[in-house]
């Protein structure tokens, strides 16, 4: 059986790892062992933080919507409840964008949410009306 020399393959793998470690500080950018460990860890952080980014942005959108809605005299929870009762299905990212860039349109959304909340309050029977005194 012929002898297999792996110099070319090993060199290519090392080169690939060092390319990924560009911009790292100290030995981790130019020694294979340290670079490989640093690159592996950086990939774990990247995987984790792709998940965290979704949470962080949702929280940011909610804060922005809450601030804009409170200026209109509602709370975030009541606003979202009113939108769902009014049958308006807009996600939080778009609501946040509308609140920032198109305040007139956002005010109309708040008004329709308030209207839906008032309408349902008027049509819902009171639980204590039939209670015996």
Curated annotation (Swiss-Prot):
Keywords on record: Ribonucleoprotein, Ribosomal protein, RNA-binding, rRNA-binding
One Gene Ontology MF term: rRNA binding
Membrane-crossing segments per the record: none
Xref: SUPFAM superfamilies: Ribosomal protein L20
GO cellular component entries: ribonucleoprotein complex; ribosome
GO biological process terms, semicolon-separated: ribosomal large subunit assembly; translation
UniProt-listed PROSITE patterns: RIBOSOMAL_L20
Alphabetical list of Gene3D superfamilies matching this protein: 6.10.160.10, Ribosomal protein L20
InterPro entries per UniProt: Ribosomal_bL20, RIBOSOMAL_L20_CS, Ribosomal_protein_bL20_C
CDD domains, alphabetized: Ribosomal_L20 (cd07026)
Family, similarity comment: Belongs to the bacterial ribosomal protein bL20 family.
Function: Binds directly to 23S ribosomal RNA and is necessary for the in vitro assembly process of the 50S ribosomal subunit. It is not involved in the protein synthesizing functions of that subunit.
Protein name per UniProt: Large ribosomal subunit protein bL20
Source organism per UniProt: Bartonella henselae (strain ATCC 49882 / DSM 28221 / CCUG 30454 / Houston 1) (Rochalimaea henselae)
Classification of source organism: Bacteria, Pseudomonadati, Pseudomonadota, Alphaproteobacteria, Hyphomicrobiales
């Amino acid at each position: 059986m012929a002898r297999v020399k792996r110099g070319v393959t090993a060199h290519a793998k090392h080169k690939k790892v060092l390319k990924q470690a560009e911009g790292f500080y100290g030995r981790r950018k130019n020694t294979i062992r340290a670079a490989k460990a640093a690159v592996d860890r950086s990939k774990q952080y990247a995987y984790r933080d792709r998940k965290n980014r979704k949470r962080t942005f949702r929280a940011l959108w909610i804060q922005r919507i809450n601030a804009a809605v409170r200026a209109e005299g509602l709370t975030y929870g009541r606003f979202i409840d009113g939108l769902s009762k009014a049958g308006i299905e807009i996600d939080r990212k778009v609501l946040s964008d509308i609140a920032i860039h198109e305040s007139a349109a956002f005010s109309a959304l708040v008004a329709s949410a308030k209207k839906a909340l008032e309408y349902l309050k008027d049509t819902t029977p009171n639980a204590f009306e039939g209670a015996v005194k």
